[in-house]
């Protein structure tokens, strides 16, 4: 493995605890857009939300709703519901996440937080958790062009943070989409974590190079001393 200079860390499920909050916001959003509980259409929509965890939220809603206006309305409702949960204190850091970001910074590794949330929601989470001093960059699909599983976010992190080669990137996430994004970007290390919804088998099938119990194991995977 080449020397890692940039770590691109996913948020919900990787550094931020997700105790069903994302799916709850999805459920509320599609309910506002007419998909009532107990209907086949709602069941299909929730299944889509589950299998696309980690991807750009607007792209997920475009899969659910054929009309662009409906997709945009659902996305706005999702962001509103999730932001309300954040404001009410319904967001917590996963154990060790802040310490890992601090340790990476001490080692000269720049930290980018990556997410499928809109920038406003992303920034509200970061500020709520007090992480601004720990990171160098935060990116959403709107900042990079396309969300996961495309490579745009890690490649944008590389460019904005002055990396010299894709092999300097470490991409860490809890979903197969995170892993695919990192692999497509050519990252030097693509690591899965087991703190989200994906199983070890699913992350292995996505070809994660390393599977960690949590992001707390990242410094060791990078060869950093305690």
Q: What is the meaning of each model-derived region?
A:
Residues 2-99:
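N-terminal helical cap/lid subdomain that shapes the substrate entry/recognition surface
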Residues 84-113, 119-123, 151:
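Short, acidic loop-to-helix structural element flanking the phosphoryl-transfer center
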Residues 14, 115, 174:
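Conserved G/P- and acidic residue-centered "switch" motifs that form tight phosphate/ATP-binding loops
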Residues 48, 91-92, 113, 169-170, ...:
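Residue-level marker of alpha-helix boundaries and capping positions
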Residues 1-5, 102, 118-119, 123-226:
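Asp-based, Mg2+/Mn2+-dependent phosphohydrolase catalytic module
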Residues 32-37, 67-70, 106-107, 130-134, ...:
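Short helix-capping segments at alpha-helix termini
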Residues 17, 113-115, 192:
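Hydrophobic residues in well-ordered beta-strands that form the structural core
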């Amino acid at each position: 493995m080449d020397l890692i200079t940039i770590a691109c860390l996913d948020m919900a499920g990787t550094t931020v605890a997700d105790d069903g909050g994302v799916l709850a916001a999805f459920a509320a959003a599609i309910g506002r857009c007419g998909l009532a509980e107990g209907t086949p259409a709602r069941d299909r929509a929730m299944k889509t939300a589950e299998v696309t965890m980690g991807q750009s939220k607007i792209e997920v809603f475009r899969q659910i709703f054929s009309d662009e206006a409906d997709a945009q309305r659902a996305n706005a409702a999702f962001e509103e519901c999730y932001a309300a949960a954040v404001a009410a204190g319904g967001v917590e850091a996963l154990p060790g996440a802040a310490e890992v970001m601090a340790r990476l910074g001490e080692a000269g590794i720049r930290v980018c937080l990556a997410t499928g949330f809109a920038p406003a929601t992303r920034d509200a989470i970061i500020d709520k958790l007090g992480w601004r001093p720990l990171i160098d960059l935060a990116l959403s699909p709107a900042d990079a062009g396309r969300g996961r599983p495309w490579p745009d976010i890690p490649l944008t992190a590389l460019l904005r943070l002055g990396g010299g080669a894709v092999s300097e990137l470490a991409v860490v996430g809890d979903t197969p989409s995170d892993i695919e994004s990192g692999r497509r970007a050519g990252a030097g290390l693509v690591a899965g974590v087991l703190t989200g919804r994906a199983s070890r088998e699913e992350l292995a099938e996505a070809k994660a190079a390393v599977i960690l119990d949590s992001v707390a194991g990242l410094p060791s995977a990078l060869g950093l001393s305690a």
